[in-house]
């Protein structure tokens, strides 16, 4: 009976070893992640050496063992722990792409090395997806929301709660504000100066306007300025003013501009209106006739007539 029991256990062990060798467990993990593998061993192998090895072409390459050897350099990314009660646990952390391969738990018992469990590990390279961008946007939004909540609290310091970009933006806005204030002050000063100058110029025109003379430049004011009479002519020029426009008859057609002679003029056929004559003590060399009611700018004048050398001006009466 005992022989049959031992034979049955041996067959089960061989079957388990064959199944472990032929059908390894497939595990897929991304770069930087971790895996945890548990292996069951027999209770009679509790004191046996447990090994976590990588299966290569030349055989099992041990990575970590249950024996504590302080002289051998340990692997900082693979940990083997014997939990007792026939349970062995292996953990691989911070996986890299070169960790891809086939691994297994091996127990070196009295019957020889026995593979308890095999694992086919595939380490996937990192693939940036839209999820990472969404998480980054969510983090930025969370940072903005948190910053806004801190700023809304009046008990907190705004400069301490603001982020670096917000603080840099405030530093850049300070010179712009001062520049705008300086420009506004310059505009106000320019407007005030312009208003004062315009007021001074207006006062100068009001004071100097009536006293300006219409004389020729380079002449003295007394000699250049002439008082004008109501006819628009200077008072020192002899002229005749007629109350009404004269009729163009033979009286004016045959008139001469020669100096007055001693003989009295012939009496006119029709008595004209008495003209206003301004007598002058000087000899008259030209005459000016002004018609009332007409344009003052249109004045009939004649060329001056030179006196003969031997003629004598009769004395005025």
From Swiss-Prot:
Keywords: Cell membrane, Cytoplasm, Disulfide bond, Immunoglobulin domain, Lipoprotein, Membrane, Palmitate, Phosphoprotein, Receptor, Signal, Transmembrane, Transmembrane helix
Organism of provenance: Mus musculus (Mouse)
Residues with a covalently attached lipid (S-palmitoyl cysteine): 208
Pro residues composition-biased segments: 261-275
Positions in the Cytoplasmic compartment: 197-317
Domain of life of the source: Eukaryota
Gene of this entry: Treml1
Stated name of the protein: Trem-like transcript 1 protein
Tissues in which the protein is found: Highly expressed in bone marrow leukocytes, splenic megakaryocytes and platelets. Detected in brain, liver and in peritoneal monocytes.
Any single GO BP term: platelet activation
């Amino acid at each position: 009976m005992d022989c049959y029991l031992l034979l049955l256990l041996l067959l089960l062990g061989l079957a388990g070893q064959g199944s472990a060798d032929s059908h390894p467990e497939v595990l897929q993990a991304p770069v930087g992640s971790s895996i945890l593998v548990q292996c069951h061993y027999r209770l009679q192998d509790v004191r046996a050496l447990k090994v976590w090895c990588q299966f290569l072409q030349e055989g099992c390459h041990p990575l970590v063992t249950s024996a504590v050897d302080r002289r051998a350099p340990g692997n900082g990314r693979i940990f083997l722990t014997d939990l007792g009660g026939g349970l062995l646990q292996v953990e691989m952390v911070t996986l890299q792409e070169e960790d891809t391969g086939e691994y297994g738990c091996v127990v070196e018992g009295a019957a020889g090395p026995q593979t308890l469990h095999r694992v086919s590990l595939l380490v996937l390279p990192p693939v940036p997806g839209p999820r990472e961008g969404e998480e980054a946007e969510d983090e930025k939004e969370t940072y903005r929301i948190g910053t806004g909540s801190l700023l809304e609290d009046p008990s907190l310091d705004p400069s301490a709660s603001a982020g670096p970009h917000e603080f840099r933006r405030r530093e850049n806005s300070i010179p712009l504000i001062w520049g705008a204030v300086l420009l506004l002050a310059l505009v106000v000063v320019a407007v005030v100066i312009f208003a004062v100058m315009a007021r001074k110029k207006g006062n100068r025109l009001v004071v100097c306007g009536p006293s300006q003379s219409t004389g020729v430049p380079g002449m003295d004011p007394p000699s250049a300025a002439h008082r004008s009479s109501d006819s628009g002519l200077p008072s020192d020029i002899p002229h005749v003013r007629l109350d009404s426009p004269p009729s163009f008859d033979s009286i004016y057609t045959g008139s001469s501009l020669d100096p007055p002679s001693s003989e009295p003029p012939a009496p006119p056929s029709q008595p004209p209106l008495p003209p206003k004559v301004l007598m002058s003590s000087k000899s008259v060399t030209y005459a000016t006739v002004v018609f009332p009611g007409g344009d003052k700018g249109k004045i009939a004048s004649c060329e001056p007539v030179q006196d003969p050398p031997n003629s004598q001006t009769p004395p005025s009466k």
